[in-house]
């Protein structure tokens, strides 16, 4: 490591130490006498870490739980991540896989119009909305 790179690394280490200690002290009660020890401990811990060596890792693409063709059934949709069956996939993706529908479609190379709701469920909700009169203009009150 060159001297300037080493100096920059040391500056970064001191800056990170200061940020971590400041964040800790702002949320915890620390006696003034223990502050130097805390700073030293954090600095030592950070000094012990190093940048990971670049290792060529052969990462296999994750395989879907079921085939994309079989994932959409009339009464349910199968999650390609875990294999679970759902009427609506959006909430499951958000809560269990921390993914948006767009990220899910991108990960599995799905078309933009890939459904997030089972076809029968969508039809039932549509029918219910029409029966309730949703989507129609209100009658003028005179």
UniProtKB/Swiss-Prot annotation:
Molecular function terms, GO-annotated: DNA binding; zinc ion binding
Keywords: DNA-binding, Metal-binding, Repressor, Transcription, Transcription regulation, Zinc, Zinc-finger
Zn-finger (C2H3-type) residues: 79-97
GO biological process: regulation of DNA-templated transcription
Keyword Zinc listed: yes
Pfam families recorded: ROS_MUCR (PF05443)
Function: Specifically represses the virC and virD operons in the virulence region of the Ti plasmid.
Family that this chain belongs to: Belongs to the ros/MucR family.
Protein name: Transcriptional regulatory protein ros
């Amino acid at each position: 490591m060159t001297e300037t790179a080493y100096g920059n690394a040391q500056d970064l280490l001191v800056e990170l130490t200061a940020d971590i200690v400041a964040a800790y002290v702002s949320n915890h009660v620390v006696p003034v006498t223990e502050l130097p020890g805390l700073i030293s401990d954090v600095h030592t811990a950070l000094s012990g870490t190093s940048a990971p060596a670049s290792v060529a890792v052969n990462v296999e693409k994750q395989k879907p739980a079921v085939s994309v063709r079989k994932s959409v059934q009339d009464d349910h949709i199968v999650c390609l991540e875990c294999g679970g069956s759902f009427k609506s996939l959006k909430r499951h993706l958000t809560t269990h896989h921390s993914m948006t529908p767009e990220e899910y479609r991108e990960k599995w190379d799905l078309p933009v119009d890939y459904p997030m709701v089972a076809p029968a469920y969508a039809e039932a909700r549509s029918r219910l909305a029409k029966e309730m009169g949703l989507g129609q203009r209100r009658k003028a009150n005179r």
